[in-house]
Amino acid sequence: MLNAFKLHKKNLFRINIDQSSLIKSIWIDIVNLTEEERRRIQNELGQNLSTSLDLEDIEASARFFEDKEGLHIHSFFFFADAEDHVGNSTVAFIIKNNILYTLRERDLPAFRLYRMRARNQTLKDGNAYEVLLDLFETKIEQLADEIENIYSDLETLSIIIMEGRKSNEYDNALSTLAELEDVGWKVRLCLMDTQRAINFLSKKKHIPYEQLDQAKGILHDIDSLLPHNESLFQKVNFLMQAAMGFINIEQNRIIKIFSVVSVIFLPPTLVASSYGMNFDFMPELKWPLGYPIAILEMILAGLAPYLYFRRKKWL
């Protein structure tokens, strides 16, 4: 799917690609590039786009470079699908002749948000670098929101873990903590990747001075978010250890109960087994009060250790 955007009085608006030419576009946004779209861009704009871009290559030399086809940046963008599966999807950015080309494999929240804002947002300088950096700013805002959401979820989990009384609450909390840790790592990877991309872009001599200041602002935002992201892992680790500790305490309590019960029933069992021995000479067997006395002896044998454990506060 191909979307093209042009400037009108420094306002970004989407054109009808079926009725308008792509010439003078400032942003060409493509989701799952087709051969037909590639040929049209080649014919109208003279830009050669590959239909088989290796978007997932994480080598810096392959993700950030400049050649005759323009300036190339491959950067991660965070997403969460309808089934709450999260991940980072790579977007390829190409800038040439003041046109920004974005090639991606899926719909991304940062792009949707930026398109909505662009309807009423005026570009200060009206160049492709500004659109690129605006997209990165939108991405950083989204990542900041994700960090805030994780903080909120951790606060809820903290209450559940510290006040929980049921084992299934701890099980669910551990599962959620693992998911939050995974989200945190993906956010961190996205932040670090963006930091590398902006550092690469800032070193280019042909980037306008105004966008250089904008890039520095993005780097400052990333530097402020990374420590917050790091503290999330510390919080997750603390809550995991706390949950595991409470689970161990509960398991030890159960084991303790079984141990005490087995000790309490051991003396009565000894008494019962003594009178269950099959010998010819056992005077108590012919005694009329032998059976009730044996039962009473078993009760006292079990009651004595129980009272002792209660006195020691082991129960």
From Swiss-Prot:
Ranges that cross the membrane:
257-277, 289-309
- Per its UniProt entry, which superkingdom is the organism in? Bacteria
Main localization is: membrane
Molecular function (Gene Ontology), one example: cobalt ion transmembrane transporter activity
**How would you describe this protein's topology in the membrane?**
Multi-pass membrane protein
Record keywords: Magnesium included? Answer: yes
Annotated family: Belongs to the CorA metal ion transporter (MIT) (TC 1.A.35) family.
Record's subunit section: Homopentamer. In the absence of Mg(2+), interactions between subunits are weakened, and dimers, trimers and tetramers can be observed in vitro.
Query: This protein is called what?
Result: Magnesium transport protein CorA
Which species is this UniProt entry from?
Wigglesworthia glossinidia brevipalpis
